[in-house]
Amino acid sequence: MGQKINPLGFRLGTTQSHHSLWFTQPKNYSEGLQEDQKIRDFIKNYVQKNLKISSGVEGIARIEIHKRIDLIQVIIYMGFPKLLIENRPGGIEKLQMNLQKEFNCVNRKLNITITRIAKPYGSPNILAEFIAGQLKNRVSFRKAMKKAIELTEQADTKGIQVQISGRIDGKEIARVEWIREGRVPLQTIRAKIDYCSYTVRTIYGVLGIKIWIFLDGE
């Protein structure tokens, strides 16, 4: 039987790079990893609480963390940074202050920068948030998937595959539905594929969304 592998981990060092860059002693490794996860969760929760977005899309594609002895550099890649910058004057400073307070960074300076993504809907995380918002509003899953594919076509992608699993449309038996447009060569390591898996809570239960986007290159 074929074993499924995470497309991002499979391509690390070729088309994918690490989202955390730091070194530490082996015994402190787990602490550093937990700290990274807490920082990412804190930022996502802060954005969720402070932004009342009509579309339900936070627009965070990924969060990179670079650590040095005296500095933690956090880079937030967003599709719609205006939501955080324009709607709330001093939004980044407040987030930085809250994060520093939360993690008690006494000896280390914390620096947060926001980078805008040129094509937001070419990112699977932003696309998954969009589909999740549609499903929560009880839009038909097929309609939501087709709309997502239309949005990626604007981002000049070469192929996309969307999969939704769970009690779709409130049916009693859980099932898996998927749709593919263009090419998605999962076996080719040189192919630049972006992937995300996302969980959405609906009134019928939890649904899982998986998205593979073939960007370019082979």
UniProtKB/Swiss-Prot annotation:
Cited InterPro entries: KH_dom-like_a/b, KH_dom_type_2, KH_sf_prok-type, Ribosomal_S3_C_sf, Ribosomal_uS3_bac-typ, Ribosomal_uS3_C, Ribosomal_uS3_CS
Record-level GO cellular component terms: chloroplast; cytosolic small ribosomal subunit
Give the KH type-2 domain ranges. 47-118
Could you tell me where this protein is found in the cell? Plastid, Chloroplast
Which keywords has UniProt assigned to this entry? Chloroplast, Plastid, Ribonucleoprotein, Ribosomal protein, RNA-binding, rRNA-binding
- Which residue windows are coiled coil? none
Instruction: Please give the Gene Ontology molecular function terms for this protein.
Output: rRNA binding; structural constituent of ribosome
Q: Which SUPFAM superfamilies match?
A: Prokaryotic type KH domain (KH-domain type II), Ribosomal protein S3 C-terminal domain
Principal localization? plastid
One BP term from GO: translation
Q: Record's Pfam families?
A: Ribosomal_S3_C (PF00189)
Q: Which family does it belong to?
A: Belongs to the universal ribosomal protein uS3 family.
Spell out the subunit comment.
Part of the 30S ribosomal subunit.
Q: Which NCBIfam families match?
A: rpsC_bact
The record's HAMAP family line, in alphabetical order, gives: Ribosomal_uS3_B
PANTHER family per the record?
Answer: 30S/40S RIBOSOMAL PROTEIN S3, SMALL RIBOSOMAL SUBUNIT PROTEIN US3C
| UniProt protein name | Small ribosomal subunit protein uS3c
Which species?
Answer: Daucus carota
